[in-house]
Amino acid sequence: MCIRDSILAEAGFRPIVIERGGRVEKRTCDVQKFWESGILNPKSNVQFGEGGAGTFSDGKLNTSVKDPSGRNRLVLETFVRFGADPSILYDNKPHIGTDVLSEVIVNMREFLVDRGATFVFDTCVNNLDIVSQKLLSVYTDSDSNSNSEIKTDVCVLALGHSARDTFDMLYNKGFDMECKSFAVGFRVEHPQRMIDESQYGIQKKIILPPSPYKVTSNFPNGRGVYSFCMCPGGYVVNSSSTKNHTVVNGMSYHDRNSKNANSAIIVSVSPKDFGADDALAGVRFQEKLETENYKRGNGLIPQQLFGDFCDDRLTTAYGDFGSCTKGNTVFAKLNGLMNADMEQSFKLGMEHFGHLIHGFDRKDAILSGMETRTSSPLRIKRDESFESNISGVYPCGEGAGYAGGITSAAIDGIKVAEAIIKKYRPDFK
């Protein structure tokens, strides 16, 4: 959300950015250690830390958000300003890559510090002082200073979608929240060469980049099945942030040079699947899947070939290609993680996509479990001024339920910054 904070700083505000994880330099070391050893730091990982979950992703910057006001362009120009390749300004499917994005984030932070912003790392918001539906203070907790108070009447909640303890705190504080639909599934790998041949043709020229794809299907049972966060030349990564939970995601570097393409193939779920309708029902649904997934792999990424998945059989060896992962893997049965209706929809989706991309439903396509954090399972409600039912608190971005990626989250952050400026600095143009 540095773009949001940049706008506030330029309007004369001095934002305090509270980050529960570490600086990106330290965070990168923590993540690499986890991938190599399996030792998870719950405070600094693929989900938590400077830059959020997007830091360890493909770094996609395309968005379906229609924004004629130019905020989308501002987001791209800001990334270029701080070190991204200028090609993102004209590329139809712009992406930064996790290696470049990490450098951009540091440049953004240093710029903001020079303009009066304060960054507080390895610190979690654990309470809010609210009187008569108005914010008075924010309380934080860190290893060096527990229950520290920051007096303020303005707080932007840019949580990310994995801050479940914070969701609990907000729910218990009386924030108006609701559960919402999202999607879960498996990360699926294919040889990048196969995808290139299907998308470009057999005589793919070397000047062409690794090909992306986007596939979607809807079925009579009301479920949608579609690709999400497709990573050409990428890696499947263990993106767990909670002990005894296993979650996967996709990531690629700027040059997208791994041998495999991967994407989450996910199945839509709605509140009727959760068995409850309170705001945290979707969170509990995710946790149930992630803990069972952890058990299947004993903390490693559980994998199964698609053909074996269809036959309900344990995989014992890869087929014609191996897996490109960050994090250790183990063969395990993924059958039964999703309910029967969802599992059947996943299989039908894969078969349908095989008609769109030759070989997509090949028997040795590699499934990794599970992809559960495609978007926030809840929404923190806000009014037309972007405030929640608690005056001074502004829910923002993906975790609050108003975005679905780097660019859309940045656009939402800009909107929130504009609302704050309008209320507190109406003279600023």
Question: Over which residues does each language-model region extend?
Answer:
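Residues forming the flavin
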Residues: I3-K429
